[in-house]
Every structure is written in structure tokens, then in C-alpha cells.
Amino acid sequence: MVAQPKGKSAILEKHDDDVVIVAALRSPMTRGKKGGLSQCCPEEMLGQVLKGVVAQSKIDPKLIDDIAVGNVLPPGGGATVARMAALWAGIPNTTALNTLNRQCSSGLAATNQIANEIKTGQIDIGIGAGVESMTQNYGAGVMPEKMSDAVMENEEASDCLAPMGITSENVAAEYNITRDVQDQFAAESYQKAAAAQKAGKFKSEIVTIKYEDEDGNERVIDTDDGIREGVTKESLSKLKPAFSKTGSTTAGNASQVSDGAAAVLLARRSVAKKLGLPIIGKFVQAAVVGVPPRVMGIGPAFAIPRVLELTGLSNDDIDIFEINEAFASQAVYSVQKAGIDPKKVNPVGGAIAMGHPLGCTGARQIATGLAEAKRENKKLIVTSMCIGTGMGMASVIVNEQ
């Protein structure tokens, strides 16, 4: 195995065997049940984003070797919908595809799978993607009716079934993350996202989605519709706890139930150069760690140091941290525990304001991070998220735009 280059100067060097990012795009993130994509089937949503990365990169679809799609709530048997999306997008049947589910990191796990296939010489070009229609597939029905009594006697095993909101309350209680601090963090997420949207900052990363709704009308969706203007800590403080009468997690300081898709087109640098493909970034490394299921939200606090250790980088080397805001409680704790400068975190807002389509988020963060890095002339990006059942994942990406 080739040794991973370590340290900032080594990471920024360019080599023919690097895994580079050729395109990274997403759909709008829209509200579950009532947002712009609530009547759009996930295969059509994902298919249009796949078309977007192919069109932007100008790649011949026949050259795409493999596609991995993150999807947590699989409709139609999981792989079926994603395969349909790729074929409909004009990608030939000779291109392989799989879906995977590592909960909230599925989009990043898919991207990492493709990156590793390129690193090991299995393929030259591939797409890591993610899609979720929480409108269609989220709810009580996704949980099994019967679980093994023997397994449920194990405390940590049974904790895997804890509602995510309860795990947020556990984090807040165990690590003393107050309601006031959570509401302040959430308000800032909304404020940053609203300012970014008003300035048109998301346009370059969004693929407009067109589809026919249930009434036969054509819908054209080109904007995130969960972002709200005028949100303050004071307005959020009026909301009631959502999961426990005495709790601190509310609908206002937790991520939104959303619909969306994202895709990242990756290639070996030598191949991208030979084909004249645009190179916008480099996928350096990813890391995944386990944490107690009852406080699953603390995952980024341990995944980020791990990926920095693997790459020989420090917090000071990183310009942008895209940390998923599943809940304000866990995001605040993770930033504090990992010793990250809050000013570097989610500069254009996060999932509290924009939404968290489960399988999509890991790929969406890459698109958002690279777009922001290009605007601000920044180099190093870390993306990270907590993962249901107790894990965290993180990646290091170089902006080359």
C-alpha cells in the first residue's frame, strides 16, 4: 500500500495518482411533505443531478466505471431506484452501480468508496452520490415491528433504536449544552444561510430540478426552501421541546426533514488530465469512528481528529469545516470538543437551516464546501457528520479552483 502523504505542504502537492473531483453538484434542499421536491420521485431527483455532473464536466458517460449511491430509506429495494436514475440520466448499462447505507454519512461513504476504488486501481472514473425522499419514505413505518428479545437485553444494542431526538437530549444533558447555546447556534445557521441565499451563493452548486407534479403541472425547483429569514435566538426560544417536556431540543434547533440529491464525479488525476476534464478539487482522505449509540451525535468530535491524524493536518490548517447540524446540541459539542474555531464552521449555514436529506448530506457538503472555498479562495476543507447508531465520519478535501 502506498503511504498517505502527511502534512499541509504534502497534501497540497499534485500527483498523477491523486483522486480528483471533477464536478460536485446538488439539487435544492426542500422541506419534507410540503417543499418543492415533495412530489418528485427520488429516481428523477437523483437522475437530474447525475445529468448535471455529466453535463458540467462534459465527460462521455461511457467512461464512468462505477457509481455508489448513499440512501438510508430505500424505496423499491434500494439499488433499484438508483440504477433506474443512472440509466435514465443517459449513463450506459455498462456502468456498474450500488447503493449503500451508513445512515447520515451515506453520501460521504459512497464518495469514499469510489475514491478508494480509484486509489486501488479498480476504476479510473466514478460517481459518489446520495439521495433521499424523506417525504415518501420517512416515518414510523421504517422501523421493524419485532426485534430480538435476546439482543435487546444488551443495553448498547437497544440504544441503537433510541429516537434521534432523544440522543440529542442525551448529549445536551451529559455535556451541559444549554438550550440558550443551542438556540444561538441554530439562529446563526439560519442567519448565515439566509444571507448566502440572498447573495446567490448557492446557485453555482444547485441543479434545477424539473418534474411533473400529481396534478400534471410542471414544477421548476431551483432554490432551497427550508431557509428562513429573520430567525433569532429569541424567536427560537419560544418553541416547545420536541422530544421531552423538560428537554432542550426543538424543531428550531434540529435539522429539517428534507428531500434532496447530490453527486460528486471523481477521477484519477492522470486520467482527468488526459481527457481534459475540469479539476475542481482533490479527495484526500476519509475516516470513520464509533461512539456510544445513546450519544451518537458526538461522532464528529472524534472523526475529525482521526482524519486530521491520518493526513498529518491540524485544525489551524483547515479553512472550512462543513459539520452536519443534525442537532445543535451535538454540533456545538463536537466543535467544542474538537477545539475548532467556530468562525470556520458552516460559513453558509448548515442542516438546521438547509435541511438534512439523510443519504444526500455527505455528498451535499462536498458541493457546498467546494463552492464556498472557490468564492473565498480557501484551500482545505473538512466535512463531517454524526451517524445514527453511534458513529462519526469525516473527510479532507483540497480546493483546486
Q: Which residues does each PLM region occupy?
A:
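Conserved catalytic cysteine-centered active-site region
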Residues: N71-I125, D159-I166, G230-Q256, K337-Q365, ...
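Condensing-enzyme catalytic core of the thiolase-fold
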Residues: A194-A195, A263-Q285, F302-T311, A326-I340, ...
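Active-site pocket-shaping loop/turn-to-helix segments
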Residues: S9-I11, S27-K51, A55, L73-P75, ...
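Beta-strand segments within the central parallel beta-sheet cores of soluble alpha/beta enzyme folds
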Residues: K62-G70, A96-N101, G126-E132, D183-E188, ...
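Flexible glycine-/small-residue-enriched beta->alpha junction loops
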Residues: Q122-Y175
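N-terminal extracellular/periplasmic Venus flytrap/periplasmic-binding protein-like
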Residues: V2, K8-V20, L25-P28, S38-Q48, ...
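Phosphate/pyrophosphate-binding loops at sites that engage ATP/ADP/AMP, CoA/4′-phosphopantetheine
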Residues: G52-D65, V171, Y175-N176, A272-I279, ...
